[in-house]
């Protein structure tokens, strides 16, 4: 499948989820707790936010994580392919004056700044070229910045939902760590959680 076809399939799927009112921000407490198997309190601790950082979330979705990050940072930028998803995220984050929500392709969007933190959860399994995605994240980090990833441990190669089928590209923790180093980052933390391995990597100050 061509990359542009994959992007269209992904966009259509997430637009359809919004039309079906499938929105993680609106999950009942039991399902919200289930999602934290990937990015709960240990993930937030690795971000190490004190209110002064600029932060980027590729694959921001409807803002499930962004709503936890925004009160803890100076400014949050989120980007997603799906127009309907971004519109929902804007609604959920409308109470915060320090957020920018963008609709576009993280890999090619012309960001005008670098960020003190970049983080992603349940995102990389949608991307075939992991090396390019991680290099892109590293390039968007300011010197001294930190990248935090939730590396999904599930190995499914397809997502079947509501009559739609999406290809997935499973993550591999060891390869992800190697690719972070290849992108010029220094791996600082590896934290196992229930459904993922959390990785944190820093960008050297002299980069």
Regions found by a protein language model. Give the residues of each.
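Class I SAM-dependent methyltransferase SAM/SAH-binding core
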Residues: 62-108
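A short glycine-rich, Lys/Arg-flanked "PGG" loop and its adjoining helix->strand segment in the class I
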Residues: 131-143
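Short alpha-helix
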Residues: 168-184
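A conserved beta-strand element that flanks and buttresses the S-adenosyl-L-methionine
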Residues: 119
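Conserved beta-strand/loop positions that form the S-adenosyl-L-methionine
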Residues: 58
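Conserved class I S-adenosyl-L-methionine
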Residues: 1-50, 148-170
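Short catalytic micro-motifs in class I SAM-dependent methyltransferases
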Residues: 122-123
């Amino acid at each position: 499948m061509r990359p542009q076809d994959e992007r269209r399939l992904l966009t259509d799927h997430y637009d359809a989820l919004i039309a079906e009112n499938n929105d993680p921000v609106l999950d009942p407490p039991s399902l919200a707790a289930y999602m934290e198997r990937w990015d709960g309190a240990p993930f937030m601790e690795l971000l190490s936010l004190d209110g002064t950082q600029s932060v980027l979330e590729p694959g921001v979705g409807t803002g499930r994580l962004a709503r936890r990050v925004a009160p803890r940072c100076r400014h949050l930028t989120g980007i997603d392919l799906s127009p309907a998803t971004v519109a929902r995220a804007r609604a959920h984050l409308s109470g915060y004056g320090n957020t920018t929500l963008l609709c576009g392709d993280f890999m090619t969007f012309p960001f005008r700044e670098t960020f003190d933190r970049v983080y992603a959860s349940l995102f990389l399994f949608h991307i075939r070229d992991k090396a390019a995605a991680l290099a892109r994240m590293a390039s968007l980090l300011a010197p001294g910045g930190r990248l935090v990833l939730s590396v999904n441990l599930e190995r499914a190669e397809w997502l079947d939902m509501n009559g739609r089928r999406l290809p997935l590209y499973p993550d591999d923790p060891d390869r992800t760590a190697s690719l972070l180093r290849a992108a010029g980052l220094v791996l600082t933390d590896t934290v196992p959680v229930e459904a993922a391995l959390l990785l944190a990597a820093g960008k050297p100050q002299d980069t």
